[in-house]
From Swiss-Prot:
Superkingdom in the source lineage: Bacteria
Family label: Belongs to the prokaryotic/mitochondrial release factor family.
Function of the molecule: Peptide chain release factor 1 directs the termination of translation in response to the peptide chain termination codons UAG and UAA.
SUPFAM superfamilies, per the entry: Release factor (SSF75620)
Gene Ontology MF terms in the entry: translation release factor activity, codon specific
Localization per Swiss-Prot or TrEMBL: Cytoplasm
A single Gene Ontology CC term: cytoplasm
Post-translational modification: Methylated by PrmC. Methylation increases the termination efficiency of RF1.
Sorted UniProt keywords: Cytoplasm, Methylation, Protein biosynthesis
Entry protein name: Peptide chain release factor 1
Positions carrying N5-methylglutamine: Q234
Amino acid sequence: MLLDKLAFIENKYDELSVKISDPSIMQNQNEWRKLCKEQADLEIIVNAYKEYKQVIEDLQVNKEMLSDESDREMKEMLNEEIASLSQREVELEKEIQILLLPKDPNDDKNVFVEIRGGAGGEEAALFAYNLFRMYTRYAERQRWSTEIMSLNETDIGGFKEVVFMIKGNGAYSKLKYESGVHRVQRVPDTESSGRIHTSTVTVAVLPEVDDVEIEIADKDVRIDVFRASGHGGQCVNTTDSAVRITHLPSGLVVSCQDEKSQLKNKEKAMKVLRSRLFEKAEQERADGIAADRKSQVGTGDRSERIRTYNYPQGRITDHRIGLTLYKLDSFLDGDVQEMINALITADQAEKMQKMGNSEM
């Protein structure tokens, strides 16, 4: 069954190659780009399949040579080659199974990250800043760009709320597992007795969506303008450049005051609103799935406590996969790839198990 599926994909890839070279299709740039993307998505699977077929062929040849060989040294060499090819065969089978998993259509998209201080007051706001810095430092390591959409600071440098955009190839595929409640355990600077406090911060990761995916009618929004404010509500602008958009059907409210231009703030706010509406629709769809089919790793439930950052022990524990890392300082400086890789692997394993169960 697996080989039949791979042969079908290879044929599809070849058909797309022919279509992409067709001058009549090339004249329609939108259609041509769509076909190019479809082919690019299949290319990695086709390349793995071609290598797999070559490995199988080489194995067959080496086994036939071994059966006819009488020289001891040649036999040893052939046995080593067969062992190496057999190992590569197993590796490729696993790689191909992962490549054949249903792809999240949002994986290649840019993201909006929303971080809000939860339980813990000022300490939660300070940790919200720590998480903001962690994600922006990770983005730098990935050579992604970041842009603040809206920010509400506290007097001592914490963030009550920050919404920012991360632009980069595959940003959503790596950051989507960060949605949920992040818990911090540490001694606040203001705590004279040395008692450990527990605070929480909520993170939401939303894929960027375009106008076609989510249409917002003018009659469904109310737009208010006001003067931008800084620390403690101090006015930092003499014009009404800040924008607040209320989506009347859903009640969602988005504010943006980071830009000096009212028009730019409106554009940013609309982008965030569009992504929030998309997430709301996706969440409503996910809520309809039976509880026993919901993902262990999870990518969307903001009320789910997903991770604990324990400062005294220098550890980070992800509760979904039971992974603990003892490198808190470097983790908060953006060294989070090990955790992300583990979450991706766990998600893939779970999906493969579900696929196996459905095929039985």
